[in-house]
Amino acid sequence: MQSRLLKQLDAAIDAAGNPVKADCLRAERACLMARHGHFDDARKTLTGLQQQYARQPNMVLSAWISLAEGLIAHYGKLGAAEAIDKIHRAYAMSGAAREPALHALCCAWLAHLDYVKHDFVSMARRVAETLKLADAKHHAARSRISLVIAQTYHFAGRYELAQPWYALTRQHGTAEGDEATLAALLANMAWLNTSQARQNVLSGPGEAQATRQAMLGAESSQNFDALVGTAALEALAPILRAQLLSLQGRHADALPLYEQHLDHALTQGAAHMANWLRADLAWCRVQLKQHDAAREDALAAEAANRDDCDLDDRAATHSRLAQVHAALGQLDAAKKHSQQAEAAWRAFADEQADVVRLIDAALT
């Protein structure tokens, strides 16, 4: 694992004159290990600290430990409820302990988790709060909240507004020596570019250039992860690639990736988009004349396409299922899904406009 931040933390631990300060830095190091997916290393550190301070807890250290536990939960499974609980606890303790830097960092992570679950109202409040709490040199908090803002604008279809915030994310992450943040930037951009390419292909004329660019971004993200030793959420990268291959019409290449990695990806946090992934898997099977299996996957996609799914995933699922049913000669079902897709894409456009208004207000 290559990380300037890791080397800096190790040096700071060695130089710390105060034992509690050194242990807080060890907990911070565990946070970094969690973000790189090295969970055993992080848990070993935290277990030792918890045992050491069991009889005489320190609130600041407890806050760092809780943040690290939350990050282990988050990077083990995106959207895990335990992550929110642990990081909110760290936020509360750091506030009570009057540790503004840690408080700001926890607030930035809560904004990130709000984004993951698409609670944009809460996210906007956290964005405004973090920007007030974190000074310009608090690179950890500033890089995280800049990434939240960037990906929110990107999600809302306003890449021109996202770009300066992506640049700030890179600037703060580089200043911190934080390769995990730079890896997250590349990965999140790749997923959002893929989502936009998906919408272009399914609801518009289809833009081959956008799909090619999204594939380049996905490959860059995967290569950077390998370079710096990031192991977190490793099943998601091949599923991202499978989607792009399918969008490019390379169904014979996409299908093995789905078959090998889909179940694992669902356990790592992709379950919220199982509706779309099952529908796209069905489409790949249709194209390869696996009609019986395609029908089964289409039924699974319909069952997973609930009202609590993200709007863009619901719209994409209906669009893909319309194609699947049409290819299978089920024209009434195809027409129904086509109509539902049109309504869902319109609702998604409304959501995007609402999100832009929320984040604009948070930044004023």
Where in the sequence are the language-model features?
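Short juxta-domain linker segments that transition from a proline/glycine-rich
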Residues: 1-68, 75-84, 91, 97, ...
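Solenoidal tandem-repeat scaffolds enriched in leucines and small polar residues
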Residues: 122-220
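C-terminal non-catalytic interaction modules
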Residues: 1-15, 20, 287-364
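Eukaryotic tandem repeat interaction scaffolds
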Residues: 210-307
